[in-house]
Amino acid sequence: MSPNQNCFFIVEFVPDGKGVPHFFDKDWIPDLPDYSFYDFPPCGDKFSSHYSLKAKTSNLSGDYFIEDDLASMDMCVLCDKLNVKFIRIPVEVELYRGRTPNKKYFLFFLKSYLSILDEERSIYSKSTDLKNENFNVSGEDERFFYDSIELFKVKDSVSENLFFCNELMLPVCSAVFKEECERLGLEGVGFKPLDDNYKYSAWDDLDLS
């Protein structure tokens, strides 16, 4: 079975309020540089070779804090095993009362940015630039932004195990990656099937009330 015959999954953050807190304040030493990862991965040259993080929580055991760009050693080892392209920078974490977590952590950025939507087989609507009535595009690759996707069919050529999906602006993984995460018991990581039941709307997370 080829990799693409398996379902792909959106990788989600699943907090438990304990070792995987919903949110915690962070003090970085030195300060992190300004960066955006929505169009392309951040430039590694902007970062220090290592960081210290004062995490304002009493416990930290999650393996992939997606919003914080923080991953455990176990997550990085799995990515190495599955040939995932990523940037890692060592982070020394200090918790409340000077405690240290049991796991080692790294700043973590995916390097593979893939457009995986098969437009011929999918059902979708693209966003428009209201200023000039043209499709809103970004950069030399002319990446479109999507208002909605009613049917998401993945291109047959997709074979990577973990990458940043350009259409959804989210991390997406293969079934192989999902199975390995579950086998290893990685904490704070969930998966939403990118199958025929999946629907996307750019307005879902906006409060328009």
Regions found by a protein language model. Name each.
Residues 62-116:
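Aromatic- and glycine-enriched beta-alpha-beta binding-site module
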Residues 39-43, 58-62, 77-83, 135-136, ...:
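N-terminal start-of-chain detector that recognizes signal peptides
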Residues 2-8, 102-104, 109-209:
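Acidic, proline/glycine-rich low-complexity IDRs
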Residues 1, 51-53, 72-77, 91-97, ...:
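Intrinsically disordered, low-complexity boundary segments flanking structured domains
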Residues 1-29:
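Short, extreme N-terminal segment that most often corresponds to the first beta-strand
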